A protein has these predicted regions:
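Specificity-determining recognition surfaces
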Residues: 1-70
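C-terminal catalytic domain of photolyase/cryptochrome flavoproteins
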Residues: 30, 42, 60-75, 79-252
Length: 252
C-alpha cells in the first residue's frame, strides 16, 4: 500500500479522538489510507499498476498477518464520495484494454463494483428495513470481549480481528468466511454482528452493512437476497490461506 503525507489536521484530530473516543477500537498510528480525493485517485492508480493483474487469481485468498494482498482497498473512498463507481469503472476498463489485463481480474473487479456494490445498494433500498429486523435462526448470543481483542482461541479468527483492529479494514473473504461465519455458527444475534461490523471498519455504512450482515453473512433474512447460507469449517479456511492446522480445527 502506498504511503500518504499526513494532513495538517492530523494531530488536532488525533487529540480529539483520544479525548472523546479513547475506548473505541482501532489504532491511530496506522493511518494507511488517504484522506482526500487526490489521495484516493492515487490509490486507485496504484492498484491498477501494481495489483490489478493478479487480482482475479488471488481475490479470495487469505494470508496470515497480511491484509491488503491484491485488493484495491478503495471501498472507504467510494462510500464517502472521494471516488465514484462510474469513474472507477471507466478508468479500470481503459487501463485493462491498454495493458492486456487478464479477463478474470477485469471481471472480478468490475463485478465487485457495479455487480455486488450496486446490488447491495438496491437491496438496502428495497428490503433494508425488513432485513434489519430479521433473525431467521433465532440466534440470541452476545459478543464477549474476546471478539473485540482477538483472544477467542481460534487462530484465523484472532488473526483477522487483530488485523481489523490495526487497519480498520480487511477484505471480503475474512469478513464473510471467517469472522461473520464463526459468529453465525456460534449463534450470535445478527444485530450484535451488525453492530460489530459497523464499529470496526472504515468503510462501514448502514446501507452497506445491513444487506451484507443480515443477508449475505448470516442468512438472517431467510433468503431475501441469497439462496443459501454461507457457512464453512476449517477445511475451507485451510484451502484458501496459509493458516496452519491446529487445535482450532477441532472446534471449527
Amino acid at each position: 500500500m502506498i504511503g500518504f503525507k499526513k494532513s495538517k489536521y492530523d494531530e488536532e484530530i488525533k487529540k480529539l479522538i483520544i479525548n472523546n473516543f479513547d475506548d473505541h477500537p482501532g489504532d491511530l498510528e496506522n493511518t494507511w489510507f488517504p484522506v482526500n480525493r487526490v489521495g484516493a485517485e492515487k490509490q486507485l492508480d496504484n492498484f491498477l499498476k501494481v495489483r490489478f493483474e493478479n487480482f482475479g487469481i488471488y481475490e479470495d485468498a487469505m494470508l496470515e498477518k497480511k491484509n491488503f494482498l491484491f485488493h484495491s482497498c478503495i471501498s472507504p473512498f467510494l462510500n464517502i464520495g472521494f471516488l465514484t463507481p462510474d469513474k472507477v469503472i471507466k478508468k479500470t476498463l481503459q487501463y485493462a484494454e491498454k495493458n492486456n489485463v487478464p479477463m478474470n481480474s477485469v471481471e472480478g473487479f468490475v463485478r465487485q463494483v457495479i455487480g455486488w456494490r450496486e446490488f447491495i445498494r438496491g437491496i438496502y433500498h428495497e428490503e433494508g428495513a425488513l432485513q434489519s429486523k430479521s433473525n431467521y435462526w433465532k440466534h440470541s448470543k452476545k459478543l464477549t470481549s474476546s471478539w473485540y481483542d482477538g483472544t477467542t482461541g481460534i487462530d484465523p479468527l484472532d488473526d483477522c480481528i487483530k488485523t481489523t483492529l490495526k487497519d480498520g479494514y480487511i477484505h471480503h473473504i475474512p469478513r464473510l468466511m471467517v469472522i461473520s461465519n464463526i459468529m453465525n455458527l456460534c449463534g450470535v444475534d445478527p444485530k450484535e454482528i451488525y453492530k460489530w461490523f459497523m464499529e470496526m471498519y472504515i468503510d462501514s455504512s448502514d446501507w452497506v452493512m445491513v444487506p451484507n450482515v443480515f443477508g449475505m453473512a448470516t442468512y438472517a433474512d431467510g433468503g431475501m437476497m441469497s439462496t443459501k447460507p454461507y457457512t464453512c469449517g476449517s477445511n475451507y479456511i485451510l484451502k484458501m490461506s496459509n493458516y496452519k492446522k491446529g487445535d482450532w480445527c477441532d472446534i471449527l
